[in-house]
């Protein structure tokens, strides 16, 4: 397991150097150590001297030189050398010793390379949370991919994670679903009835109605009903609850097939069954007041543009109130014995305006402002032959998660939905995956994995007889660059755990694959005239493939050998 990253180790040494040379303490977050943009200038670099220049009133290049002098005089197996370059950067060249240790660690850890020691940090992340009124559409697919991948990264970083799906079953939409299924059932029984305009027109109500008909035949054909309600409450409840359960079963199956799982499904109806709203109102205390027969929440106390109604004058709750109660439940839970440090939501851009309102509500409950973080994602567009599919559940024209899987497969879907920042719009061109001469970014990465795997298989006996992991002959710049990338993999996980930018996993993997393909094209890897060099290269390739495999696993994509 990873205790610390190479960057953290370099930062600690630089911090010690600053304290020794300049008698001041610098915060680790105040300066950068990162992978060098070009391997010619070192494996890593730091801007610490330029950060200190104004404080020390000194030329940054002179500061950098003094830090390099400290690092040179204090023996460490980390560095081959360091150099100060204008205007004040410090370039770091890693030693062969630490590179050899890296190869040993990767080959020892294998699938767990990049997994950190457990930390006492617990997060709840709620995502997807689609109304159980139809199949998940491709917007939900992106939400699911983001949430699951972020959960995977946090777990790899050592956090305790609870993944949650909120079932919105408390509103009128579920009643409409039940009536939609009832009308389809009547049609199945031979009745000439027309669906109401706000009913769900998709295939799911038809499928559920057929299940009911198969079990009960025409048992309910003569019940009395209006446009929006079945008079017999038990029959109405049956159609509503049965429909909700069946739709949730469809959703759960699609999520499972998409490699997405949840630790908890929490229905909104449970909030009412357990009478959790009134205690939440009481907890809001002084921030609740009555006006015009309604209860208002004084959200303006925390910067909202206006106060919000939480209980209407007819004593019914606004949709805001059960949401407040639900977020209170999440924020006060323990997760595997740990208090919840932060709650996360992934919402579509159409809910962006709701973020500040919910943040303020949690402050009214006594939580810190940063108890909740919301990742707002943009929509997804699927095109084929230049035409866009439109989405509307009620009209039955929704492009579903299942459609996406059928069109381009689970692995391609997961990659494409993660490969851009959440705030960016995504357009997926189906032709890219169905045309024989097209290459997707995922296939490019898998092709790199495949190339390496075939080389390793052909040289399996040579690898087995080698007991050491030397790196002194790996002097090619692309070899050095790949080694630096291997060092950087755990840091990538650490960065994403704090920035939530999961699209940086595909970027990392594509960059590593690109290096491999370039190396493969330019270098005669299998050079049998130099056995030691060949062994070192094989060990490098072995490590590269392990990191590709581990990185893909964070996306729930299996590393597999392509046949081309």
Curated annotation (Swiss-Prot):
Domain of life: Bacteria
GO cellular component: cytoplasm
Protein name: Arginine--tRNA ligase
Protein location: Cytoplasm
TM stretches of this protein: none
Entry similarity comment: Belongs to the class-I aminoacyl-tRNA synthetase family.
EC number assigned by the record: 6.1.1.19
SUBUNIT field: Monomer.
InterPro entries: aa-tRNA-synth_I_CS, Arg-tRNA-ligase, Arg-tRNA-synth_N, Arg-tRNA-synth_N_sf, ArgRS_core, DALR_anticod-bd, Rossmann-like_a/b/a_fold, tRNAsynth_Ia_anticodon-bd
Gene: argS
Catalytic activity: tRNA(Arg) + L-arginine + ATP = L-arginyl-tRNA(Arg) + AMP + diphosphate
């Amino acid at each position: 397991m990873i205790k610390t990253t190479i960057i953290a180790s370099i930062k600690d040494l630089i911090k010690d150097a600053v304290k020794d040379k300049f008698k001041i303490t610098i915060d680790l977050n105040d300066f950068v150590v990162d992978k060098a943009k070009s391997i010619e200038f070192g494996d890593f670099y730091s801007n610490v001297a330029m950060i200190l220049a104004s404080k020390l009133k000194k030329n940054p290049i002179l500061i950098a030189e003094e830090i390099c002098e400290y690092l040179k005089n204090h023996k460490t197996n980390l560095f081959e050398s360091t150099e100060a370059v204008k205007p004040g950067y410090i370039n770091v060249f890693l030693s062969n010793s630490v590179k050899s240790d890296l190869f040993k660690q990767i080959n020892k850890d294998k699938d767990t390379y990049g997994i950190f020691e457990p930390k006492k940090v617990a997060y709840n992340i709620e995502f997807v949370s689609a109304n159980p009124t139809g199949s998940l559409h491709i917007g939900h697919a992106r939400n699911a991919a983001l949430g699951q991948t972020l959960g995977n990264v946090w777990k790899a970083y050592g956090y305790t994670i609870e993944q949650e799906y909120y079932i919105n079953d408390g509103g009128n939409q579920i009643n409409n679903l039940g009536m939609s299924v009832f009308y389809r059932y009547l049609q199945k029984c031979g009745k000439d009835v027309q669906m109401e305009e706000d009913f769900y027109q998709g295939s799911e109500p038809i499928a559920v109605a057929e299940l009911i008909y198969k079990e009960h035949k025409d048992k309910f054909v003569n019940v009395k009903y209006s446009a929006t309600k079945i008079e017999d409450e038990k029959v109405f409840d049956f159609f509503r609850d049965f429909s909700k359960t069946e739709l949730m079963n469809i959703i759960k199956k699609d999520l499972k097939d998409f490699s997405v799982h949840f630790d908890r499904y929490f229905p909104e109806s449970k909030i009412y069954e357990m009478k959790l709203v009134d205690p939440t109102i009481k907890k809001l205390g002084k921030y609740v007041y009555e006006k015009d027969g309604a209860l208002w929440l004084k959200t303006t106390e925390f910067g909202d543009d206006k106060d919000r109604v939480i209980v209407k004058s007819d004593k019914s709750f606004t949709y805001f109130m059960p949401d407040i109660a639900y977020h209170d439940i999440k924020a006060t839970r323990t997760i595997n014995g740990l208090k919840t440090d932060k709650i996360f939501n992934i919402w579509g851009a159409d809910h962006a305006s709701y973020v500040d309102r919910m943040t303020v509500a949690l402050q009214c409950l006594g939580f810190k402002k940063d108890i909740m973080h919301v990742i707002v994602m943009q929509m997804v567009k699927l095109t084929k032959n230049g035409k866009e599919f439109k989405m509307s559940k009620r009209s039955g024209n929704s492009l579903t998660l299942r459609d996406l899987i059928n069109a381009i497969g689970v692995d391609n879907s997961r990659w494409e939905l993660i490969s851009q920042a959440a705030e960016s719009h995504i357009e997926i061109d189906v032709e890219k995956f169905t045309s024989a001469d097209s290459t997707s970014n995922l296939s490019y990465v898998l092709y790199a994995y495949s190339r390496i795997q075939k080389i390793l298989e052909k040289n399996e006996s040579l690898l087995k007889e080698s007991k050491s992991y030397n790196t002194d002959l790996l002097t090619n710049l692309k070899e050095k660059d790949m080694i630096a990338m291997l060092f950087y993999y755990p840091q990538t996980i650490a960065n994403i755990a704090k920035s939530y930018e999961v699209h940086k996993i595909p970027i990392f993997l594509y960059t590593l694959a690109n290096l491999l393909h370039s190396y493969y094209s330019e270098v005669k890897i299998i050079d049998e005239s130099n056995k030691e060099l060949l062994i070192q290269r094989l060990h490098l390739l072995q490590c590269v493939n392990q990191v590709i495999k581990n990185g893909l696993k964070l996306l729930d994509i299996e590393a597999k050998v392509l046949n081309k």
